[in-house]
């Protein structure tokens, strides 16, 4: 293997006198490097802003965004959708959901307590996927900072108010396959976008013909 040769740059001459130092300072300050930096700064100053004034302004979130959970109600009656089956508690990988139920007079499950430990939750969304009644869904409330754990995690914080359910002021859960807002603008080109569809002549040439089927048609 040949030895690689490195090119050594000449060292910069040392400046000793005050006149030379002044000339070097003026050359460095008023040189092309300074104007290049200023030109880039001025260009970005007049370009459209890519940031927003948070928290006064917020970007729209995707329906598939996974934040703090919501416990839904029925839109017509305002009753709770949760039937106390416990599937969300069983499938939870972080073991953060706790449900306490009892049988009522009509032999149906009644929910005594429903808690979610947000300190352990990893927001995977498995509880929302397995729920047969769409009772628990992933919401878009991501501003949940608190100084005490006792301030969040109870059922009353996740449950949709009965008034909002009857007034239909809360949107129905669109599901994990819902389309995000402005998806056309945010969609990036994939390799399949560059594949051209074959023309009609090429497709006809590529379709094979079965001679046995043709013979059968002639005999008929």
Curated annotation (Swiss-Prot):
Cofactor, free-text remark: Binds 2 [4Fe-4S] clusters per subunit.
UniProt keywords (A-Z) are:
4Fe-4S, Cell inner membrane, Cell membrane, Iron, Iron-sulfur, Membrane, Metal-binding, NAD, Quinone, Repeat, Translocase, Ubiquinone
InterPro entries according to UniProt: 4Fe4S_Fe-S-bd (IPR017896), 4Fe4S_Fe_S_CS (IPR017900), NADH_quinone_OxRdtase_chainI (IPR010226)
Residue limits of the 4Fe-4S ferredoxin-type domain? 71-102, 112-141
Query: Which reaction(s) does the protein catalyse, per the Swiss-Prot or TrEMBL entry?
Result: a quinone + NADH + 5 H(+)(in) = a quinol + NAD(+) + 4 H(+)(out)
Q: What is its EC number?
A: 7.1.1.-
Question: Which top EC class is named for this enzyme in its record?
Answer: translocase
- Which terms in the GO cellular component ontology are assigned? plasma membrane
- Where, in this chain's numbering, is [4Fe-4S] cluster 2 bound? 92, 121, 124, 127
Write out the GO MF terms.
Answer: 4 iron, 4 sulfur cluster binding; iron ion binding; NADH:ubiquinone reductase (non-electrogenic) activity; quinone binding
Obligatory cofactor(s):
[4Fe-4S] cluster
The record describes its membrane topology as: Peripheral membrane protein
Question: Where, in this chain's numbering, is [4Fe-4S] cluster 1 bound?
Answer: 82, 85, 88, 131
Q: Where is this region: Disordered?
A: 187-220
- Main localization of the protein described in the UniProt heading: membrane
What processes in GO biological process is this protein linked to? aerobic respiration
Q: A single Pfam family, by name?
A: Fer4_7
Cellular location(s): Cell inner membrane
- Does the keyword field hold Kinase? no
State how it assembles: NDH-1 is composed of 14 different subunits. Subunits NuoA, H, J, K, L, M, N constitute the membrane sector of the complex.
Q: Which family does it belong to?
A: Belongs to the complex I 23 kDa subunit family.
Function of the protein: NDH-1 shuttles electrons from NADH, via FMN and iron-sulfur (Fe-S) centers, to quinones in the respiratory chain. The immediate electron acceptor for the enzyme in this species is believed to be ubiquinone. Couples the redox reaction to proton translocation (for every two electrons transferred, four hydrogen ions are translocated across the cytoplasmic membrane), and thus conserves the redox energy in a proton gradient.
* Name assigned to this protein: NADH-quinone oxidoreductase subunit I
- Taxonomic placement: Bacteria, Pseudomonadati, Campylobacterota, Epsilonproteobacteria, Campylobacterales
Q: Which gene encodes it?
A: nuoI
